[in-house]
Amino acid sequence: MASKSDAIAPEKEKALNLVLSQIERNFGKGAIMRLGDAARLRVETISTGALTLDLALGGGLPKGRIIEVYGPESSGKTTLTLHAIAEVQKQGGIAAFVDAEHALDPVYATSVGVDIDNLLISQPDTGEMALEIVDQLVRSAAVDIVVIDSVAALVPRAEIEGEMGDAQVGLQARLMSQAMRKITGNIGKSGCTVIFLNQLRQKIGVTYGSPETTTGGQALKFYASVRLDIRRIQTLKKGTEEYGTRAKVKVVKNKVAPPFRIAEFDILFGKGISTLGCLVDLAEETGVILRKGAWYSYNGDNIGQGRDNTITHLEEHPDFRATVEQQVREKLALGAQVSANTVGAAPAKTAEDTDS
């Protein structure tokens, strides 16, 4: 059966080829093409370090796109992006961190897995300087991921040079809008992933709906391909000692996969995201590991009493861990349905989990 392109009249086909050639001469190869002729229709992704979140995102953070991660203070925003940086570095990629808040802890970044010796870092004085650095890094096509921490700290030069208390209406919003227009095209061409961390503010006088909003105006919301809302939902304890938090991430916007999915995972103090915790949760949901009462079993053999002991068993047996992870990934690739809308939802607490 002839395709639609074959059915085009010869004179139209000739005129079309002529104008396509002219456009490519003027603007470069790839400036315009048939969608089916694109070399890569499938968007490549970067792992977040949390298998549950990768699943909710449809594979991970998309390359060559703008991503916004927002949430309350100490919810895990920086930890999540440091894990993404570590994953890029494991693949031989180059990462940059624009530390507008001047708060990056190199010791913690190392504990998460970041190679700080090869991490590019900038601590800009103004918002204009920060975004110009981002634009130049993106246009170089030599950097694979750039993280900006945070939008709220991108203070316009006019505000810094002005007096305390001066009314500076909409300066940051205009700055972000101009930056988005400038860098978005370059991001797509270079394949660089740009992640903006953002803070929450309260809207005054809101009676209905959520009073929460993000800083920096509306531009980032429109230009971002993925928006992640991360919240701390639980404090993890062993007895009375706190050792981490449980985080919940909602995919508020996703242009490359179905949105509104939710993922949960543990963040351990001083260590970052618990990758083994994510693996145990998904192994249970996909049926690779079964749970009866407090006991977790694999192929009929008990491997741990309680979730924490099961995680320890996987940590002590790397070959077994690799087998479980392979089976989980195979089931997820085949479209296995998880038991809940929330990916990696924490199981009900058992007596063993409570005592440990």
Curated annotation (Swiss-Prot):
One of its GO terms (molecular function) is ATP binding. Keywords: ATP-binding, Cytoplasm, DNA damage, DNA recombination, DNA repair, DNA-binding, Nucleotide-binding, SOS response. GO terms for cellular component: cytosol. Its main location: cytoplasm. Pfam families: RecA, RecA_C. GO terms for biological process: DNA recombination; DNA repair; SOS response. The keyword Transport does not apply. It comes from the Bacteria. ATP binds at G71, P72, E73, S74, S75, G76, K77, T78. It is found in: Cytoplasm. HAMAP family: RecA. PANTHER family: MITOCHONDRIAL DNA REPAIR PROTEIN RECA HOMOLOG-RELATED, RECA. Belongs to the RecA family. Can catalyze the hydrolysis of ATP in the presence of single-stranded DNA, the ATP-dependent uptake of single-stranded DNA by duplex DNA, and the ATP-dependent hybridization of homologous single-stranded DNAs. It interacts with LexA causing its activation and leading to its autocatalytic cleavage. This is Protein RecA. The lineage of its organism: Bacteria, Bacillati, Cyanobacteriota, Cyanophyceae, Synechococcales.
